[in-house]
């Protein structure tokens, strides 16, 4: 696993069940409300500060998700896309990386083709067993509770870039221009 982590230059993440806890709440106008964990936002920003590109690939599209993507400065994304294998290959092409340089993090059946398309795969702790059986690494953190951050720390540690998250200077650099 260490060798795989050292080679990662691109991370593709699912949203519902990974960056959120997977629950959908609706306001009085019928608009979906989601919550995102601040640690995951920091993990995304830290990867980008360490020259590791991050993309979002979601089966859903919503104004709140587009806002989160914009807030984090993510440039590559596909929203409302359930066929994730082709989407992963398209994102890799846009990022200029190979499958071996790409990691994917997901939580459910819809992510199985993406796991197969990418060189390294992660599942959140609360993913179903058949999803856990399909990935390279099962995280100890649940989706929406900092699972992305757990993965990003692993990648940065493996690449000798842990100063991005384990020093005050690295942390301050990452949050300087971000609303988390």
From Swiss-Prot:
Mg(2+) binds at residues 14, 16, 107. GO terms for molecular function: 3-deoxy-manno-octulosonate-8-phosphatase activity; metal ion binding. Its EC number is 3.1.3.45. It comes from the Bacteria. GO terms for biological process: lipopolysaccharide biosynthetic process. Keywords: Hydrolase, Lipopolysaccharide biosynthesis, Magnesium, Metal-binding. CDD domains: HAD_KDO-like. It catalyses: 3-deoxy-alpha-D-manno-2-octulosonate-8-phosphate + H2O = 3-deoxy-alpha-D-manno-oct-2-ulosonate + phosphate. Substrate binds at residues 16, 37-41, 45, 60, 68, 84. Its cofactor is Mg(2+). InterPro entries: CMP-NeuNAc_synthase, HAD-like_sf, HAD-SF_hydro_IIIA, HAD_sf, KdsC_fam. Belongs to the KdsC family. Homotetramer. Cobalt was used in the crystallography experiment but magnesium is likely to be the physiological metal. Catalyzes the hydrolysis of 3-deoxy-D-manno-octulosonate 8-phosphate (KDO 8-P) to 3-deoxy-D-manno-octulosonate (KDO) and inorganic phosphate. This is 3-deoxy-D-manno-octulosonate 8-phosphate phosphatase KdsC. It comes from Haemophilus influenzae (strain ATCC 51907 / DSM 11121 / KW20 / Rd).
């Amino acid at each position: 696993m260490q060798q795989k982590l050292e080679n990662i230059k691109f991370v593709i993440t699912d949203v519902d069940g990974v960056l959120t806890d997977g629950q959908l709440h609706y306001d009085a106008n019928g608009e979906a409300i989601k919550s995102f964990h601040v640690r995951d936002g920091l993990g995304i920003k830290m990867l980008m500060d360490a020259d590791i590109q991050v993309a979002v690939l979601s089966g859903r599209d919503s104004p709140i998700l587009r806002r989160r993507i914009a807030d984090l400065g993510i440039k590559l994304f596909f929203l409302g896309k359930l066929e994730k294998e082709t989407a992963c290959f398209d994102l890799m092409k846009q990022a200029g990386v190979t499958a071996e340089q790409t990691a994917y993090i997901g939580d459910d059946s819809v992510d199985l083709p993406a796991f197969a398309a990418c060189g390294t795969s992660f599942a959140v702790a609360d993913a179903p067993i058949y999803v856990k059986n399909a990935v390279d690494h099962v995280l100890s953190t649940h989706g929406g509770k900092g699972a992305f951050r757990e993965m990003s720390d692993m990648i940065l540690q493996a690449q000798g870039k842990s100063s991005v998250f384990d020093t005050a200077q690295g942390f301050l650099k990452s949050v300087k221009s971000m609303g988390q």
